[in-house]
């Protein structure tokens, strides 16, 4: 039977995060006709609610020293635990600078080096303790995208969700207020800059359009079926379909089937339900890295929901600043609280054959001085503690409210306070890494005291914390140009993927700030080039 089509274009891009918009921008700039479809009513996906930082480890824009490919590869290999595709990682590292130049030349998006932001494991071989590998999207005047400014994804979000304290918040507002225009920052700026480039090329994303089926045969993918306005339409793709649909962290069945441990909750928009993954699997796509996610510790405030489900907030300042620790039900610490967030999944997922997950549940425990000096998750310094803080004058009372063993916690606090007096953490090395103090107390007299401080001022507080995710990291396996590979090992003709819709190329590794968006844009760029050239 001859296929009938409602629409036709060269390249269909599904999703409008950094990966999808980059792919669409490149494909259109290279001469292909492009149609972009977005499941949500707004554009930007997870990128729009992120920090808008990209990690490009061998770019040529850093001040004070050259960033080399060799150092970047050495660094990623040192933290990969052997789960890394060397060819794809090298492709990412080598292509990054070219992608930056191309995107800046073909869109309104511009980048600047995030000076001083260290790599996440800077002491490893090839690491950068002084930073330089992460780049920010520059502030962007939203007036340039007209009515689309109000159609970029946003959360009912406050700065506590992204780990920005009152001082930094004030600096951001002051800088933006000094600009002449309606400027946005972070992930919103990244999306707006890419979107402006696409709009200038005559490509307008179609929203509330959910892709439900890839159309094709053994000879390749020829189009996609999309639900739009209550009916199905069939869109022919003369060259390719590019999946930029995000991960599967909001689909409980897929989470339970694939992730290597419990997921407390995602911090991404709730549209990431594995649509691209399912469509690719239906055509025999090989899968990789399915047990992994971009992990992050999260707190859920009672009664706070998103899409009818508990809303998760990432915690960074709260666990890094002095006078707070994380303990399990036995009252024992089990990790470096100030360490980079992705690696915390290992301790949270520690499984005892007899006791189950010994570090889940867990709590952030802090004292009155911490709350007075730093605040906590949107509560300003010196603010009133809400009921869900589990305020207790004694450790025995804290045990009654939370179940944390009082004797175990007392022993932990004694050992902790003794160690802090010597400015060391002999158990987990908190304060030893250049990264540990980055989100700490910058007014502290020594680097160690940016994150180390005693817990000795009642009342005490205990807030439940678990491991969440910014997105999943597994999906269809691809080649160096983003072509989705069949289980046979051969590319599926006409099908590409990028971002969290593809298997993460760095395996378990998370290089630094922007370690998600850097690869997403690089492989979106390469997929766009390859798709347009078919």
Where are these regions (language model features)?
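Glycine-rich active-site loop/strand segments that organize a redox cofactor
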Residues: 56-92, 153
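C-terminal structured subdomain/cap of oxidoreductase catalytic cores
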Residues: 6, 25-26, 35, 233-240, ...
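Beta1/beta-strand and adjacent pyrophosphate-binding region of the FAD-binding site
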Residues: 5-17, 35
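Conserved redox-cofactor binding core of oxidoreductases
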Residues: 93-229, 300, 420-448
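Glycine-rich FAD pyrophosphate-binding loop
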Residues: 29-48
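Glycine-rich loop(s) and the adjacent beta-strand/alpha-helix scaffold that form part
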Residues: 181-188, 229-304, 351, 517, ...
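A glycine-rich dinucleotide-binding beta-alpha-beta segment and adjacent secondary-structure elements
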Residues: 213, 217-220, 408-505, 509
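An anion/pyrophosphate-binding glycine-rich loop and adjacent beta-alpha core
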Residues: 122, 126-130, 139-166, 277-279, ...
């Amino acid at each position: 039977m001859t296929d009938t089509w409602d629409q036709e274009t060269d390249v269909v891009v599904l999703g409008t995060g950094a990966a999808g918009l980059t792919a669409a921008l490149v494909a259109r700039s290279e001469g292909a006709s492009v149609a972009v479809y977005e499941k949500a009513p707004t554009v930007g996906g997870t990128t729009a609610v992120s920090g808008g930082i990209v990690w490009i480890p061998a770019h040529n824009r850093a001040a004070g020293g050259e960033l080399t490919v060799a150092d970047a590869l050495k660094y990623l290999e040192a933290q990969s635990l052997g789960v890394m595709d060397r060819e794809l990682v090298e492709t990412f590292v080598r292509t990054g600078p070219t992608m930056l130049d191309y995107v800046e030349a073909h869109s309104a998006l511009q980048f600047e080096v995030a000076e001083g932001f260290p790599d996440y494991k800077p002491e490893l071989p090839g690491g950068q303790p002084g930073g330089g590998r992460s780049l920010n999207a520059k502030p962007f005047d939203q007036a340039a995208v007209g009515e689309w400014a109000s159609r970029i994804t946003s959360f009912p979000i406050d700065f506590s969700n992204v780990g920005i304290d009152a001082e930094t918040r004030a600096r951001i507002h002051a800088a933006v207020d000094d600009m002449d225009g309606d400027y946005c920052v972070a992930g919103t700026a990244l999306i707006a800059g890419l979107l402006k480039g696409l709009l200038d090329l005559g490509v307008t994303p179609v929203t509330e359009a959910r892709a439900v089926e890839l159309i094709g045969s053994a000879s390749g993918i020829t189009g996609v079926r999309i639900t739009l306005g209550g009916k199905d339409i069939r869109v022919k793709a003369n060259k390719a379909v590019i999946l930029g649909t995000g991960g599967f962290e909001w689909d409980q069945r897929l989470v339970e089937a694939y992730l290597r441990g419990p997921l407390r909750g995602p911090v991404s928009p709730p549209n990431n339900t594995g649509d691209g993954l399912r469509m690719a699997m239906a055509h025999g796509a090989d899968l990789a890295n399915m047990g992994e996610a971009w992990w992050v510790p999260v707190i859920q405030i009672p009664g706070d929901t998103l899409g009818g489900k508990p809303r998760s907030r990432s915690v960074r300042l709260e666990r890094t600043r002095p006078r707070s620790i994380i303990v399990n039900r036995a009252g024992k610490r089990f990790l470096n609280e100030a360490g980079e967030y992705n690696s915390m999944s290992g301790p949270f997922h520690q499984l005892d054959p007899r006791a189950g997950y010994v570090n889940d549940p867990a709590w952030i425990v802090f004292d009155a001085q911490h709350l007075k000096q730093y605040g906590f998750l949107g509560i300003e310094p010196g603010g009133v503690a809400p009921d869900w803080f589990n305020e207790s004058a004694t450790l025995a009372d804290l045990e009654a409210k939370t179940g944390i063993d009082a004797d175990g916690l007392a022993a932990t606090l004694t050992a902790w306070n003794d160690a802090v007096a010597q400015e060391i953490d002999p158990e987990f090395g908190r304060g030893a890494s250049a990264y540990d103090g980055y989100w700490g107390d910058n007014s502290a007299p020594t680097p160690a005291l940016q994150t180390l401080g005693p817990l000795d001022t009642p009342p005490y507080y205990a807030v439940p914390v678990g491991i969440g995710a910014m997105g999943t990291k597994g999906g269809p396996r691809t080649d160096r140009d983003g072509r989705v590979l069949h289980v046979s090992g051969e590319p599926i003709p006409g099908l590409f993927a990028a971002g969290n819709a593809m298997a993460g190329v760095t395996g378990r590794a998370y290089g630094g700030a922007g370690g998600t968006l850097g690869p997403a844009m690089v492989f979106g760029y390469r997929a766009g080039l390859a798709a347009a050239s078919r």
